[in-house]
């Protein structure tokens, strides 16, 4: 997969989550352009949400959490979002960054380094967390039907 393909897939995920949020929070919106802090914002609650879409979890059994891009902290280490919405092919998980960090710490997980993908420029450090373990730390999970 290329960086651009992944970006497009991620934007579809953001719109999917935004549609769900609109039922309860009609003023929620997708942040325009690149905004490091979060992808979606709920003015009614003054809360930002980071959305992660993963099309490989059903094959690998892992969710992927970024901690560094190049040599700089990123992802879970720098997030300002109150919530993360993590989308797999079959599930939507609602989890706080603190619970992700707790999962990593409780289970002595170590980030692994991966080379850049096509269209990207820097290596990444990623935590690979078994989906079954990740689900235990999520505040809520919703079954979705094979979103691709």
Region spans (language model):
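Residues that flank catalytic or metal-binding motifs in active/ligand-binding sites
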Residues: 36, 45, 80
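Alpha-helix C-terminal capping segments
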Residues: 17-22, 40-44, 84
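Intrinsically disordered, low-complexity regions of eukaryotic proteins
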Residues: 16, 41, 52, 68, ...
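Conserved catalytic cores of phosphodiester-cleaving nucleases, focusing on short active-site segments
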Residues: 40-57
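Acidic-basic catalytic patches of nuclease active cores, encompassing PD-(D/E)XK
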Residues: 1-36, 55-56
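Short, flexible, glycine/charge-rich loop motifs used to bind or transfer phosphoryl groups or to couple energy/partner
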Residues: 29-31, 38-40, 73-75
């Amino acid at each position: 997969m290329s960086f651009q393909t992944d970006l497009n897939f991620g934007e579809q995920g953001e719109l999917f989550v935004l549609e769900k949020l609109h039922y309860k929070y009609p003023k929620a919106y997708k942040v325009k352009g690149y905004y490091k802090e979060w992808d979606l914002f709920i003015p009614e609650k003054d809360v930002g949400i980071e959305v992660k879409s993963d099309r490989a979890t059903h094959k690998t059994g892992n969710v992927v959490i970024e901690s560094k891009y190049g040599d700089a902290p990123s992802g879970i280490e720098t997030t300002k979002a109150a919530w993360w919405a993590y989308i797999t092919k079959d599930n939507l998980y609602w989890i706080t960054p603190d619970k992700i960090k707790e999962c990593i710490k409780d289970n002595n997980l170590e980030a692994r380094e991966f080379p850049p993908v096509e269209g990207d420029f820097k290596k990444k450090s990623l935590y690979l967390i078994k989906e079954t373990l990740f689900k235990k730390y999520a505040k809520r999970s919703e079954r979705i039907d094979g979103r691709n």
